[in-house]
C-alpha cells in the first residue's frame, strides 16, 4: 500500500485519466472529499481504473488528493519549493547532489506520515529520491 501512495504521488504530473465531473464521482467519494475540504475551490476530478484524483485550491494552495472508489483518502500531495524542506533534507541535497538541479519536488501526506519526493537532474543523469523520515534521502524504487 505504501508503494501505491508513492507511485500515485510520483505520477501526479503524468496522470492522464478521464475527466469526471461531480456527477460521475461516486457519492461516498464526494462526501469524503467535502467533509475533509469543505471550502475547496476550483475542484476538478479525474477517474482512474481504481481510484479518483482530485485537483483543487485550498487555503491558497493547489493540492491533489487521491481517493479509493469507496471514499478512502489514500494521500494528499502538493508541489513545494526547496525552502519548505526540513533542514536535514536541504543540507543533504547541498552536500550530496550539489551538481544537480531540482526538476520536481512534492510533499505527500497520508496515514503513514509525511514523505518528500524529488527529481534531480544534471547534464548526464536524472534521479528520483524519496524521504519518509525527514532526515535523509534514498533512491525511489517503484
Locate predicted features.
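Bacterial Sec-dependent N-terminal signal peptides
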Residues: 1-24, 33
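Interaction-mediating elements
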Residues: 21-142
Amino acid at each position: 500500500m505504501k508503494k501505491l501512495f508513492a507511485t500515485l504521488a510520483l505520477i501526479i504530473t503524468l496522470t492522464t485519466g478521464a475527466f469526471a465531473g461531480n456527477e460521475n464521482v461516486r457519492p461516498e467519494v464526494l462526501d469524503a472529499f467535502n467533509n475533509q475540504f469543505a471550502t475547496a475551490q476550483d475542484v476538478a476530478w479525474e477517474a482512474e481504473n481504481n481510484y479518483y484524483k482530485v485537483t483543487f485550491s485550498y487555503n491558497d494552495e493547489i493540492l491533489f488528493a487521491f481517493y479509493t472508489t469507496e471514499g478512502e483518502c489514500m494521500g494528499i500531495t502538493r508541489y513545494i519549493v526547496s525552502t519548505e524542506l526540513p533542514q536535514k533534507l536541504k543540507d543533504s541535497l547541498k552536500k550530496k547532489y550539489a551538481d544537480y538541479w531540482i526538476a520536481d519536488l512534492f510533499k505527500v501526506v497520508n496515514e503513514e506520515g509525511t514523505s518528500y519526493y524529488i527529481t534531480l537532474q544534471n547534464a548526464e543523469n536524472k534521479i528520483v529520491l524519496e524521504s519518509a523520515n525527514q532526515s535523509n534521502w534514498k533512491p525511489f524504487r517503484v
